[in-house]
């Protein structure tokens, strides 16, 4: 009887935990999302609007958040037509964390100078794998109050 239970248990299919990918998939997702993250920041550095916009999900569900609140949609996004770029952008502590298969969270600390004004804060991205490759589905930027020392970790 013990033998039958052991055999039955050994032959029973094991269900994977929801939201957890195989290690190779998590690693690949993380590497690919980080590559897109770096592409996004590099496009800002090079003021390459086409490359910058190509990193984003171009749908009505693109989420952009900051101190003024959540805004949705690609079509009404001011970045599509703006000619403003920061004079300098220093991005540090770039980190990515796999959430589930095809979804990766990313964050970085920033210091940006534009027109003799420097501010710093934290920016976040949520990367999703699409049939067209990896895209940014959520982007945020939260600046520190003026005069506050950098505190990002």
Language model features with spans:
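Bacterial N-terminal signal peptides
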Residues: 1-8
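Short, low-complexity N-terminal intrinsically disordered segments enriched in polar/charged residues
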Residues: 11-55, 147-153
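Short beta-strand edge/turn micro-motifs at domain boundaries
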Residues: 12-18, 120-153
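Post-signal/leader-peptide non-cytosolic segments of secretory proteins
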Residues: 23-31, 44, 53, 71, ...
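Hydrophobic pocket/interface hotspot
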Residues: 40, 52-53, 60, 77, ...
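A short gly/proline-enriched turn/hairpin at secondary-structure junctions
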Residues: 55-71, 82-85
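Short, well-ordered beta-strand segments in beta-rich or mixed alpha/beta enzyme
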Residues: 56, 62-65, 103-113, 126
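Surface-exposed, charged secondary-structure patches
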Residues: 75-120
């Amino acid at each position: 009887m013990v033998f039958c239970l052991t055999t039955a248990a050994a032959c029973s299919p094991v269900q994977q935990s929801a939201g957890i990918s195989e290690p190779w998939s998590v690693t690949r997702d993380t590497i690919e999302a980080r590559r897109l993250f770096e592409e996004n920041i590099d496009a800002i550095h090079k003021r390459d609007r086409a490359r910058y916009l190509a990193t984003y999900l171009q749908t009505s569900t693109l989420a952009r958040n900051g101190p003024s609140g959540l805004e949705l949609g690609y079509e009404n996004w001011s970045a599509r037509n703006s000619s403003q770029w920061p004079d300098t952008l220093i991005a540090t502590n770039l980190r990515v964390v796999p959430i589930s298969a095809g979804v990766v969270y990313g964050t970085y600390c920033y210091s940006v100078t534009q027109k003799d004004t420097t501010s710093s804060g934290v920016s976040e991205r949520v990367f999703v794998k699409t049939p067209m490759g990896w895209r940014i589905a959520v982007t945020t930027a939260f600046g520190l109050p003026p005069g506050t020392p950098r505190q990002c970790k």
